[in-house]
Amino acid sequence: MGILNKIFGTYSERELRRVNPIVNKIEALDEKMQSLKDEDFKLKTEEFKSRLEKGEKLDDILPEAFALVREAAHRTIGLKHYREQLIGGVVLHQGRIGEMKTGEGKTLVATLPAYVNALTGKGVHIVTVNDYLAKRDRDLMAPVYEFLGLKVGVILHNLNNEERQEAYGSDITYGTNSEFGFDYLRDNMVVYKEERVQRKLNFSIVDEVDSILIDEARTPLIISGQGEKSTEFYKVADYFTKSLIAEKDFTIDEKANSAMLTDEGVNKAENFFKVDNYADAENMEIQHHVVQALKANYVMKKDKDYMIKDGEILIVDEFTGRAMEGRRYSDGLHQAIEAKEGVRVERESKTLATITYQNYFRMYNKLSGMTGTAQTEENEFREIYGLDVIVIPTHEPIARIDNADVVYKSEKGKFKAIVDEIVERYKKGQPMLVGTVSIEKSEMLSSMLKKKGVPHQVLNAKYHEKEAEIISHAGEYGMVTIATNMAGRGTDIKLTKEAEEAGGLMIIGTERHESRRIDNQLRGRSGRQGDPGESRFFVSLEDDLMRIFGSERIQGIVDKLGLAEDEAIESKMVSSAIESAQKKVEGNNFDIRKTLLQYDDVINKQREIIYKQRSEVLEGEDLKDQIRDMIRDVVYTAVNSHISGVEEEFQTELQNLVNYLEDICLPKALVKVKDISNLSDEEIKEKLLEAVENIYIRKEKEIGEEQIREIERVILLRVVDTKWMDHIDDMDHLKQGIGLRAYRQQDPVQAYQFEGSEMFEEMIYNIKVDTVRYLFHVEVEKAPEREKVAKETSTNYDEDSVKKQPIKKENRIGRNDMCPCGSGKKYKNCCGRMA
């Protein structure tokens, strides 16, 4: 591969050769654009729109449009895109990922493809990782777009519905990945189409694309309401778990990030909970709580995985070190941590709507992204999102010196060496950014530096508010900044003249992350736009990466050398062992994400069907034909599932059939068994359908045609939503137990697809039955008005969200329970065949 690259160039170099002629055309138009008057810019925008309407393609107008934006930026904000930024703009317009190093002006680059694609009138979303960056980037670039006659909006967390509609109605909309995703989910829960805020998803430019599409890929967006389970069991399970002895009663698997009971632990559980067989299916509730309590107490670490703030457990993002306000671990883990830490245990939530970032962003017509580090994950971008990665050349050559890793035997020796290095460089005034992997480590290092009298600033999840301000001073002379991982990403570190003379920004990594990309991001904070700088990672054999994934061979060599804890090793073998450990973890994580996507694709296809149908109900005014089809399906399926063809059971079956339909849509005693006992199956269907349709027609006359249409719409939407929420829960439970199928020589993914599909079919029938039932039992005093309905859900990311009333869960019949209609058959073989 290396030889081929030398002959033909890398993939990026080959692709850039195709982009260069386009950029030459853009640059050639520079003089023409400079001759335009200010008022001509808006006229050019109108001209482009008109050309597109007449059939020209975006690529036809691209050189001229890019040249126009370039000149507009120069006149409004005093910045002119240089050649490399124009290349980046073309790559993004083509629906690719542009790898642009820190400080190369990604925010300015985005204006080029955003403007061109906004000319279609279908909207462009520019996605950033937090509200601060979304607002900052919008404020910085708005003068450029407005000068060109385009409207630009920003979606912030605290906006109301009208403000969101206005922002999404703009030509270009800035916002965070979570706001865009949650708005999509909320739009699919509204009762009136006027309440929707988003348009169809057209073109998205994702800033820090690796962070959003890879690091966050496993994080589902969940809108939840409050569940109804008691929280007491979490406290009991916590009390039991704290009485256990490590290794004897339970074991911890660090690679899998889990803990499980040993045989001895199981015996203790049976005695404590007074059950005969802990593994019994009827004890699943106990198992669930114990597993989560074990994980909370012995796997999850305070100030690394979560932190406590004002009596609340906040998740700490493992990639950015930021506190994820309002986000909660799912599946009861958050409650188990609350019980462990002795804070108030909140009730488990019920999922009302959910989607992963993977599936949300794959819905855009065109997707592109920017980041400083994407190449290590190129395969994943290509395989999952169909995006290729193009490395954009830097404007100035990178002058940063990346030193080899220094490896120590113990963590204590490593931190002593880090402090010595900081003290040494502090004396000559060189600014330093020290990256740590957890709050705990950053605070430990901070106290060591205090003892040495080195002034410094700490940036971690606890001080999130000051993040941008702290990071903006990190390039000043003699400034030492300790930051958890990638905190402050998106804010440039600019060097002062004195700092530059002292050697530029020194990056010190206190531990290798399990992903090479995160390490590269930390390195990339130094050496922006040709600035001087330096980087070095300090590693110990006690670090998580080396301990869990490193090779025992290294440990053996170190032991043979008999190194003291503060003696360092610099060797190629150790460096390559670290890299292979990282590759191992990256491969492992990619496989996990791929498998999760296979599972998520099942429910994603189902979600698409439900949301598409829901949208049609919202848009369509008249559902009469659909309702009549539902009535026919309910009646016909009821007849098919109740009548077996066994003569001696015929009368009983007819009675059960009539009872069943009386519960749904027939008035009592309207149809008697004797009226239908001499008819064939087909005649019974027609007779019953005629009776039900007559009632429907009568109801329509009583209530009024306009009102009944509105009632049908509201009932159908409510039933779809309720059944879909229950289905999400059911699919979740199915997924949790599906791994055990491997023991039965079954492919778990195939089993999940097959059973999930069956459950979906059942849900569709349930929707029909319940819609008909509610419609035939509705009594109207006053017509429902088309007014703004109160939201009954809260998003799980919103710390200020109002506490909602618990959703009442209907008593649901198990598939293997006896059917309530009295037939003596199992529910799944009787009414359950259609419900």
From Swiss-Prot:
<dbReference type="GO" id="GO:0006605">
    <property type="term" value="P:protein targeting"/>
</dbReference>
<keyword id="KW-0862">Zinc</keyword>
<keyword id="KW-1278">Translocase</keyword>
<dbReference type="InterPro" id="IPR000185">
    <property type="entry name" value="SecA"/>
</dbReference>
<dbReference type="Pfam" id="PF01043">
    <property type="entry name" value="SecA_PP_bind"/>
</dbReference>
<feature type="binding site">
    <location>
        <position position="831"/>
    </location>
    <ligand>
        <name>Zn(2+)</name>
    </ligand>
</feature>
<dbReference type="InterPro" id="IPR014018">
    <property type="entry name" value="SecA_motor_DEAD"/>
</dbReference>
<dbReference type="InterPro" id="IPR004027">
    <property type="entry name" value="SEC_C_motif"/>
</dbReference>
<dbReference type="GO" id="GO:0005737">
    <property type="term" value="C:cytoplasm"/>
</dbReference>
<dbReference type="GO" id="GO:0008564">
    <property type="term" value="F:protein-exporting ATPase activity"/>
</dbReference>
<dbReference type="InterPro" id="IPR036266">
    <property type="entry name" value="SecA_Wing/Scaffold_sf"/>
</dbReference>
<keyword id="KW-0067">ATP-binding</keyword>
<comment type="subunit">
    <text>Monomer and homodimer. Part of the essential Sec protein translocation apparatus which comprises SecA, SecYEG and auxiliary proteins SecDF. Other proteins may also be involved.</text>
</comment>
<keyword id="KW-0479">Metal-binding</keyword>
<comment type="function">
    <text>Part of the Sec protein translocase complex. Interacts with the SecYEG preprotein conducting channel. Has a central role in coupling the hydrolysis of ATP to the transfer of proteins into and across the cell membrane, serving as an ATP-driven molecular motor driving the stepwise translocation of polypeptide chains across the membrane.</text>
</comment>
<dbReference type="GO" id="GO:0017038">
    <property type="term" value="P:protein import"/>
</dbReference>
<comment type="similarity">
    <text>Belongs to the SecA family.</text>
</comment>
<dbReference type="InterPro" id="IPR020937">
    <property type="entry name" value="SecA_CS"/>
</dbReference>
<dbReference type="InterPro" id="IPR011115">
    <property type="entry name" value="SecA_DEAD"/>
</dbReference>
<feature type="binding site">
    <location>
        <position position="85"/>
    </location>
    <ligand>
        <name>ATP</name>
    </ligand>
</feature>
<dbReference type="Pfam" id="PF07517">
    <property type="entry name" value="SecA_DEAD"/>
</dbReference>
<keyword id="KW-0472">Membrane</keyword>
<dbReference type="GO" id="GO:0031522">
    <property type="term" value="C:cell envelope Sec protein transport complex"/>
</dbReference>
<feature type="binding site">
    <location>
        <begin position="103"/>
        <end position="107"/>
    </location>
    <ligand>
        <name>ATP</name>
    </ligand>
</feature>
<protein>
    <recommendedName>
        <fullName>Protein translocase subunit SecA</fullName>
        <ecNumber>7.4.2.8</ecNumber>
    </recommendedName>
</protein>
<feature type="binding site">
    <location>
        <position position="819"/>
    </location>
    <ligand>
        <name>Zn(2+)</name>
    </ligand>
</feature>
<dbReference type="GO" id="GO:0065002">
    <property type="term" value="P:intracellular protein transmembrane transport"/>
</dbReference>
<dbReference type="InterPro" id="IPR027417">
    <property type="entry name" value="P-loop_NTPase"/>
</dbReference>
<dbReference type="InterPro" id="IPR036670">
    <property type="entry name" value="SecA_X-link_sf"/>
</dbReference>
<keyword id="KW-1003">Cell membrane</keyword>
<dbReference type="InterPro" id="IPR011116">
    <property type="entry name" value="SecA_Wing/Scaffold"/>
</dbReference>
<dbReference type="Pfam" id="PF21090">
    <property type="entry name" value="P-loop_SecA"/>
</dbReference>
<keyword id="KW-0653">Protein transport</keyword>
<feature type="binding site">
    <location>
        <position position="492"/>
    </location>
    <ligand>
        <name>ATP</name>
    </ligand>
</feature>
<keyword id="KW-0547">Nucleotide-binding</keyword>
<keyword id="KW-0963">Cytoplasm</keyword>
<dbReference type="GO" id="GO:0046872">
    <property type="term" value="F:metal ion binding"/>
</dbReference>
<dbReference type="InterPro" id="IPR011130">
    <property type="entry name" value="SecA_preprotein_X-link_dom"/>
</dbReference>
<dbReference type="InterPro" id="IPR044722">
    <property type="entry name" value="SecA_SF2_C"/>
</dbReference>
<keyword id="KW-0813">Transport</keyword>
<dbReference type="GO" id="GO:0005886">
    <property type="term" value="C:plasma membrane"/>
</dbReference>
<dbReference type="InterPro" id="IPR014001">
    <property type="entry name" value="Helicase_ATP-bd"/>
</dbReference>
